[in-house]
Amino acid sequence: MAAAPQAPGRGSVRKTRPLPVKTSLNNPYSICWGVLDREDMHFILQTLEDRIQSLGLQKIEDRKRKKKQPPLKKQSGDTSSIDVDTGEDLKKEKPKGDAQASGWTPVDVRKQLAIGINEVTRALERNELLLALACKSAKPAIVTSHLVQLSVSRGVPACQVPRLSERLAPVLGLKCVLALGFKRNTTAFGEELRAILPRVPRLNVAWLQDALEDPRENLQTESLESQDEEILDTSFEDLSKPKRKLAEGQQPVVLQPLKIKKLIPNPNKIRKPPKSKRTASK
């Protein structure tokens, strides 16, 4: 005999909600810092540390905080006199502590530097730097990775220096120094930059090959007279030629294939229903 059909259950079957999948395209180019030699790393750190110490550049912070004094108890005349004496002593000691004002000691030298990721980023956007240094201890690495494209687009030499924050932060009186930039108007670090720039490795960004320059070439700046003579020597035919020609020995930019990347959340995660559905089920 055939089995009798079963009556459908009273409770409604709960449908599983499909997991949201985020689809995006990956980045085919790998952006990375140039490899700095160990000897060059020690030379850069030692040179900057010695120069900063000789200039006396340091940030002084007033760490003395006013401690809350307990309420005065009126017990006898002796205690009140003691409290008055201690108050007068504190007033006398305050001017001694405030004699050394908080802030940067040589303000003019501080204006020649860009300290911190935000300052270095803004200075690179305005094309105000001669050299940009980033600390390798910055985590996550994406915090300083944008400095690679920025520095190459502006033609500014940049490199990642290990132990930059560990060596320079105590000298500057800061907790950490994740990025350091030297502005174009610097006069206090002129000789140091001439010695450091040849040791900076060259950065490689695939879509910014025209902006790449050798740091050593930046040291030998041409005079305005020589530039004017070259412009006068160029004929009208040379100026009328199309400018979009690859230089000799320059490799053309090759388009890389893109891959579709899907981000799927964890399916094993226990997701609680919203409060509105909880109250409806009850």
Curated annotation (Swiss-Prot):
Any Gene Ontology biological process: rRNA processing
Disulfide bond entries: none
A GO molecular-function annotation: ribonuclease P activity
Modified residues (Phosphoserine): 12, 226, 235
InterPro entries noted in UniProt: Ribosomal_eL30-like_sf, Ribosomal_eL8/eL30/eS12/Gad45, Rpp38
Compositionally biased spans, kind Basic and acidic residues: 88-97
Modified residues (N-acetylalanine): 2
Region listing for Disordered, in residue ranges: 1-21, 61-103, 262-282
Subcellular location: Nucleus, Nucleolus
UniProt feature, compositional bias: Basic residues: 269-282
Pfam families membership: Ribosomal_L7Ae
Transmembrane regions listed in the UniProt entry: none
Sorted UniProt keywords: Acetylation, Nucleus, Phosphoprotein, rRNA processing, tRNA processing
Quaternary structure and interacting proteins, as annotated: Component of nuclear RNase P and RNase MRP ribonucleoproteins. RNase P consists of a catalytic RNA moiety and about 10 protein subunits; POP1, POP4, POP5, POP7, RPP14, RPP21, RPP25, RPP30, RPP38 and RPP40. Within the RNase P complex, POP1, POP7 and RPP25 form the 'finger' subcomplex, POP5, RPP14, RPP40 and homodimeric RPP30 form the 'palm' subcomplex, and RPP21, POP4 and RPP38 form the 'wrist' subcomplex. All subunits of the RNase P complex interact with the catalytic RNA. Several subunits of RNase P are also part of the RNase MRP complex.
Family: Belongs to the eukaryotic ribosomal protein eL8 family.
Protein role: Component of ribonuclease P, a ribonucleoprotein complex that generates mature tRNA molecules by cleaving their 5'-ends. Also a component of the MRP ribonuclease complex, which cleaves pre-rRNA sequences.
Annotated protein name in UniProt: Ribonuclease P protein subunit p38
Organism, scientific name: Bos taurus (Bovine)
